[in-house]
Amino acid sequence: MGRVPCCEKDNVKRGQWTPEEDNKLLSYITQYGTRNWRLIPKNAGLQRCGKSCRLRWTNYLRPDLKHGEFTDAEEQTIIKLHSVVGNRWSVIAAQLPGRTDNDVKNHWNTKLKKKLSGMGIDPVTHKSFSHLMAEIATTLAPPQVAHLAEAALGCFKDEMLHLLTKKRPSDFPSPAVHDGAGAGASASALAAPCFPAAPPHHPQADDTIERIKLGLSRAIMSDPSTASAAAAAAAPSAPAEDKPWPPGDMSEGLAGMYATYNPAAHAHAQAQAEFRYDGASAAQGYVLGGDGDQGTSMWSHQSLYSGSSGTEEARRELPEKGNDSVGSSGGDDDAADDGKDSGKGAASDMSGLFASDCVLWDLPDELTNHMV
């Protein structure tokens, strides 16, 4: 439920008050006073609302009110009080005898506000416009504004460097997932992915690889068992020769080695190498003794070729040379020296076959590329 209206709006007069209405209201209040504003309009014979009668009495008909223009002293008081309390018009009017809050508000909005603006003073803050502009400039432009451009440029450079060096997910190799024993390796690969870089190209390394391949091909062709089997399979009806491989298309250096190769000397050198006395072992003493005064070193049983078993001729000569060396009671020193010299000469001939540019070992292309 709302407040009960003070009068019926249908029979209420609106608009400006006439002098007759002012006289009726003034004579009634002077005689009966201001007791009940709801009954005053009816008792005074006015077709006005009770609120309208109250405002007309308070703001215009009271005997202690001042009518007319505000003095300079009153205006200065209003300006000072407004700078302190703001738009609290009732408080300001209480400091001005004979002036109502409505009169003070109307005078401020119609005259004093425009007057202050014309003087270069803000009517809200009561400060000069130049002072306000200085405060705004100080607030919006801190002392660090000179370094803002440099700082922004540095941030831009850092961001661009980050974007250029950032790897996309498509650049990362996707690790393959295997079952069984490879599950742990796959998990570790997923946890710590690696980014292998392509190895640089070195022409010198390519030349070294080619030399290694050439040495391997020469070593395979110089192996008696492999070369004999290949020759027998390739040409079973070919005439027997002293060399274990057939002369085919070969380089000039390989043809020279093919012409100087002697299988008998090769077998003799291998037999001497298997039963020769090592110099270092002879100086240190023999660990394996025979029937005679001479022994065999534990390092002397080394073959000139890794994995080579010699020829049939070397196998036949092997027991005979062993019996001769064991049966003799000391032997002829010259004969022994001659045998050693011949063995060393044959070994040196065969060692020349594998010069520094001939390497016996090679790796597949995949491992070779990775190693380079």
Swiss-Prot record:
InterPro entries: Homeodomain-like_sf (IPR009057), Myb_dom (IPR017930), Myb_TF_plants (IPR015495), SANT/Myb (IPR001005). Residues 37-61, 89-112 bind DNA. Residues 9-65, 66-116 form the HTH myb-type domain. Residues 312-323 have a biased composition (Basic and acidic residues). Keywords: Developmental protein, DNA-binding, Nucleus, Repeat, Transcription, Transcription regulation. Residues 298-347 are annotated as: Disordered. Essential for tapetum development in anthers and microsporogenesis. May regulate the timing of tapetal programmed cell death (PCD) which is critical for pollen development. This is Transcription factor MYB80. The gene is MYB80.
